[in-house]
């Protein structure tokens, strides 16, 4: 595949491998990051059971890691200053913490400005306040859980995050401070917001992300659903090794218990680092003991059902974490090797060579203004202006310096809005302005081909997609349980 910009190298996965924490302010403009990389899904839950709907259902309304990703806030209004003169009051109690009216109104103002800058409809104020209050409650519950779990964020951690944000925006730290001041956000408050994001990111990683696994069977099913030559990596063959502690058919309960105890002792030795093959040669009662217990490569359908179920999702070198019982006795199992039978090294995938021009929307550029600019630029390109020169001059994507070139891309690498519009174009044709969560794009298809893509790369891609889906589902379940277990007392009507 052709060399790509940093943006598109990141976009080879359909979603980020990690989404960091809840934002303590709904921030506005995407000033850095991959223009085509699908943003993290919103991480909110409505009240106690259902995912939050409305203003937070799209990625850029409440981005999951806006501060750490490099997003800077838009300009503030005078309402916050005027509000500081008002007497504050508690609107909700979350376990032992409180949420104040000033905090609620400030956050609602920020979300409202965000939506306006993106040319999106702003909900009725009462609905907006209700959703924002639920978001603040979720943030409180997570922060409390993180602190109770002993998770801490040092000043040095925050310093590194500040430096990273500045670098992503091509700013020095002092310039970043100036930008924050212009937006009306105090630097100390910005640091605390960053600290909160890091705290919640670490909590999520420990409680959710690190516990999610993707199994080979899931990858096979995913690829099969995609169809085509990439549907599967072939029939899997497994080489399983066993240590058998035999049990006679007429063995007493005591004899069976003793055999199980011996097998469990052998399993503990293996888990402790003992050489499996040596233990098999010394202790196994199976015919293949002299070969280190290895049964040899065979399709999973030719393995005993108990063995197949136990090893199907293991990686080579892993040991089944419990003793398996069969009519022959008790087995300690290890997956020695797994490979696809007769698998082609590569498979054909339809690829598109594409380039684009991006204009980002934000507080200084509405979607309508961006659309008008791109429409005028498209007219010039259609009448002879070089697309690459236009991209270098006007595009705000990291691919601009390469004339907007994204190289050869495979299905699923780019965000759906972009990919759908790209699929309708003929080579050489330039799209009308296309909107995504990153802004508006002009897209030009340069060519199409059937490419040989390594099967292992397809499987890596499938793994990342499946993991992202499972992580998101697990996170939503975990967050819902966390919310349900919290004691929340509303001091005012949430719709006020």
Swiss-Prot record:
Record bears the keyword Transmembrane: no
GO cellular component: outer membrane-bounded periplasmic space
Notes concerning its domains: The PPIase activity resides only in the second parvulin domain. The N-terminal region and the C-terminal tail are necessary and sufficient for the chaperone activity of SurA. The PPIase activity is dispensable for SurA to function as a chaperone. The N-terminal region and the C-terminal tail are also required for porin recognition.
Organism: Ralstonia nicotianae (strain ATCC BAA-1114 / GMI1000)
Residue ranges constituting the PpiC domain according to the UniProt record: 235-337, 349-447
InterPro entries in the record: OMP_Chaperone_SurA, PPIase_dom_sf, PPIase_PpiC, PPIase_PpiC_CS, PPIase_SurA, SurA_N, Trigger_fact/SurA_dom_sf
EC id: 5.2.1.8
Endpoints of the signal sequence: 1-42
Positions of the UniProt region annotated as Disordered: 53-80
Name of the featured protein: Chaperone SurA
UniProt KW keywords: Chaperone, Isomerase, Periplasm, Repeat, Rotamase, Signal
GO MF annotations in UniProt: peptide binding; peptidyl-prolyl cis-trans isomerase activity; unfolded protein binding
Compartment annotation: Periplasm
Catalytic activity: [protein]-peptidylproline (omega=180) = [protein]-peptidylproline (omega=0)
Top EC class of this enzyme: isomerase
Biological role stated in the UniProt entry: Chaperone involved in the correct folding and assembly of outer membrane proteins. Recognizes specific patterns of aromatic residues and the orientation of their side chains, which are found more frequently in integral outer membrane proteins. May act in both early periplasmic and late outer membrane-associated steps of protein maturation.
PANTHER family in alphabetical order: CHAPERONE SURA
Biological processes annotated in GO: Gram-negative-bacterium-type cell outer membrane assembly; protein folding; protein stabilization
Main location: periplasm
Superkingdom of source: Bacteria
Keyword Signal: yes
């Amino acid at each position: 595949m052709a060399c790509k910009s940093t943006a598109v190298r990141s976009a080879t996965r359909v979603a980020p491998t990690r989404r960091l924490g809840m934002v303590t302010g709904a921030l506005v403009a995407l000033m850095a990051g991959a223009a085509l990389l699908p943003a993290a899904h919103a991480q909110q839950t409505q009240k106690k059971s259902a995912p939050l709907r409305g203003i937070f259902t799209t990625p850029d309304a409440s981005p999951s890691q806006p501060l750490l990703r490099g997003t800077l806030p838009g300009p503030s209004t005078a309402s916050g200053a005027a509000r500081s003169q008002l007497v504050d009051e508690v609107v909700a109690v979350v376990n032992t913490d409180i949420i104040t009216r000033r905090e609620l109104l400030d956050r609602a103002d920020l979300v409202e400005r965000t939506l306006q800058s993106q040319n999106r409809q702003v909900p009725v104020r009462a609905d907006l306040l209700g959703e924002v209050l639920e978001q603040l409650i979720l943030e409180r519950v997570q922060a409390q859980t993180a602190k109770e779990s002993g998770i801490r964020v040092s000043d040095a951690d925050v310093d590194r995050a500040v430096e990273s944000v500045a670098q992503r925006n091509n700013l020095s730290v002092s310039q970043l401070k100036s930008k924050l001041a212009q937006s009306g956000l105090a630097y100390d408050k910005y640091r605390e917001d960053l600290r909160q994001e890091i705290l919640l990111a670490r909590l999520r990683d420990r409680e959710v992300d690190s516990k999610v696994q993707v199994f080979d069977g899931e990858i096979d099913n995913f690829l099969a659903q995609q169809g085509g030559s990439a549907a599967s990596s072939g029939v899997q063959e497994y080489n399983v090794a066993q240590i058998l502690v035999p049990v006679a058919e007429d063995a007493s309960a005591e004899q069976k218990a003793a055999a199980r105890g011996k097998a469990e002792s052998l399993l503990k030795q293996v888990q402790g680092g003992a050489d499996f093959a040596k233990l098999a040669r010394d202790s196994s009662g199976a015919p293949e003991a002299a070969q280190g217990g290895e049964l040899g490569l065979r399709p999973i359908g030719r393995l005993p059902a108990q063995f197949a179920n136990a090893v199907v999702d293991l990686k080579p070198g892993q040991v089944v974490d419990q003793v398996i019982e069969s009519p022959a006795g008790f087995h300690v199992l290890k997956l020695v090797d797994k490979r696809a039978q007769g698998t082609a090294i590569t498979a054909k995938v339809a690829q598109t060579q594409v380039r684009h021009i991006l204009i980002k929307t934000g507080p200084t550029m509405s979607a309508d203004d961006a659309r008008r600019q791109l429409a005028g630029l498209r007219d010039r390109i259609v009448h002879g202006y070089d697309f690459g020169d236009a991209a270098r001059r006007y595009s705000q994507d990291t691919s601009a310096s390469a004339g907007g070139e994204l190289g050869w891309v495979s299905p699923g690498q780019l965000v759906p809005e972009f990919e759908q519009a790209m699929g309708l174009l003929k080579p050489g044709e330039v799209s009308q302005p296309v909107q995504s969560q990153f802004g508006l794009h002009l897209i030009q298809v340069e060519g199409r081909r059937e490419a040989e893509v390594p099967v292992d790369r397809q499987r890596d891609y499938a793994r990342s997609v499946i993991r992202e889906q499972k992580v998101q589902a697990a996170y939503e379940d975990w967050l819902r349980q966390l919310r349900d277990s919290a004691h929340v007392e509303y001091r005012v009507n949430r719709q006020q």
